[in-house]
Structures are given as C-alpha cells and as structure tokens.
Amino acid sequence: MRPMTHVPVLYQEALDLLAVRPGGVYVDATLGGAGHARGILERGGRVIGLDQDPEAVARAKGLHLPGLTVVQGNFRHLKRHLAALGVERVDGILADLGVSSFHLDDPSRGFSYQKEGPLDMRMGLEGPTAKEVVNRLPLEALARLLRELGEEPQAYRIARAIVAAREKAPIETTTQLAEIVRKAVGFRRAGHPARKTFQALRIYVNDELNALKEFLEQAAEVLAPRGRLVVIAFHSLEDRVVKRFLRESGLKVLTKKPLVPSEKEAAQNPRARSAKLRAAEKEAP
C-alpha cells in the first residue's frame, strides 16, 4: 500500500462546526484517508466511516483506530448502512465531496488528466467506465453531458473532437483524451483545458449529483436533535445542491456564507482552493 498522503481540507473548521462531544456517534460519509475521522476520534467521538472504494476501506481498516467502524458503501444508502449496524440516530455527519488524493495520484484509477492510465473514473469499481462513456455516447448526449456536468463552454467542439477521434480508434487512456481536448480548444489561462471534461465524466460515471441529493435527504432524517451536518463541496454544481437543500430542509443553517480555505491552506494544499464548507443543525422539537 502507498503511504497516506491525503490532506483533509478545512480540517479545523469542519471539526469545530461538527461540535463533537465525547461519546457521541458521528458519520464520516466520505472516509477516504480517515483524516477527518481521526479528528472526531481525538475529540472523544465514535465514528462510522463510509467509503464506496474497496481500496480506501482496506486502508482504513488497516489503521486499527479504536472507535472507528468502517463500512464499504455509497453514502446515498446512508440509512441502509446505519440500519445494518442497528443505528437509528447520529450526533453529526460530515461529508468531504472532493476527489481523494489517492484517486488523483493513482494513474490506474483514471481520474487524472496529467498522468497516463486507463479511462476508468469509477469510485466504487462498479458500473460503466469513462472509457465506455466517451466511446459510446452519441454526439448530442456527449455535448450535453460536458455542458451540464462540466459547465464547459466549448462542450460541442470537444464532443465533436471526441467522436472524430473514436471513429479512427477507441479512446483508451486519460492522456489520450486530455490531448484530444487540448487540440480541440487550445490552452487556457485558468487551468488545464481538459479539467472540466474530466469533471463532467467523473460526475456522470459515479452519478454524483443524484447520490448527493439522496444522501442529504437521509442525513437530515437520521440526525438526532441538535445533531449537525457539515458538507465540503468542491465545485459549483455540488455547492448549489447543498445550498438549496439546506435552505429547504428545515435545518438551522450555521453558515450564512460558506467557509473557504485560508490563503495559507490554499497555498499549502492547492486542491483545497475551490472548497466551500456549509453546515446546519437539526433543531430540538
């Protein structure tokens, strides 16, 4: 196994808003490298950690952290996973929606446009891969996917380039796709030209926005009175879903404006730059 290098984003802010109390039961719905989970444990809480990635689950179990129960599964099935443990109510729920550093740093998972690997992008290693999507989706559907899930202004041009390329030979790797996009749109000042294309494909492959909506609805249900929900989003589509849900959920919103990383944290951890943290509390009846 590779060494643990994942850096939790907005670590202190998330734990402070979660208001961990000794003996309380908390859900880390995106366990990953267990960074946030460790913080909850250090404050005396018990943690149920969910992750759909079997590799992340194996890493977390290998830590043998007292008070941590590790469950493999998608957070969209939160209530089901808690019921299997005999848990009806929890004192807090944390979700860090960012792509794990483990995923980005492992070329074999296919998340990075900067490292060559198979076009996969599946968080849970089940279902269709990004390779299947880019090689099979019709032009119009592909353009719509890039426009709606990647907020890509040149979606149609990129989709046309992908279709033209796959007519010659299947698109197999991350760098192959990234080069197709680069040639289609050229270089950009704001990041790599393939960034939004890769975001769109990842969201589509993992059905991320629907999963997030289902998770949020269930999270509000299983929170105990005065229990808190803390969510860290990393792009505007996610943040929009979280913001709308909190506004309509009946929960007491604790963050009038989302918390964002300090300049120091953003400099130390560039992947944190786009993070936005929102939190809410379930009021006592």
From Swiss-Prot:
Specifically methylates the N4 position of cytidine in position 1402 (C1402) of 16S rRNA. Gene3D superfamilies: Putative methyltransferase TM0872, insert domain, Vaccinia Virus protein VP39. CDD domains: AdoMet_MTases. S-adenosyl-L-methionine binds at residues 34-36, 51, 75, 96, 103. Keywords: Cytoplasm, Methyltransferase, rRNA processing, S-adenosyl-L-methionine, Transferase. It is found in: Cytoplasm. Belongs to the methyltransferase superfamily. RsmH family. It catalyses: cytidine(1402) in 16S rRNA + S-adenosyl-L-methionine = N(4)-methylcytidine(1402) in 16S rRNA + S-adenosyl-L-homocysteine + H(+). It comes from Thermus thermophilus (strain ATCC BAA-163 / DSM 7039 / HB27). Its EC number is 2.1.1.199. Residues 258-285 are annotated as: Disordered. The keyword Ion transport does not apply. One of its GO terms (cellular component) is cytoplasm. GO terms for biological process: rRNA base methylation. This is Ribosomal RNA small subunit methyltransferase H. GO terms for molecular function: rRNA (cytosine-N4-)-methyltransferase activity. The gene is rsmH. InterPro entries: RsmH (IPR002903), SAM-dep_MeTrfase_MraW_recog (IPR023397), SAM-dependent_MTases_sf (IPR029063). The keyword rRNA processing applies. Its main location: cytoplasm.
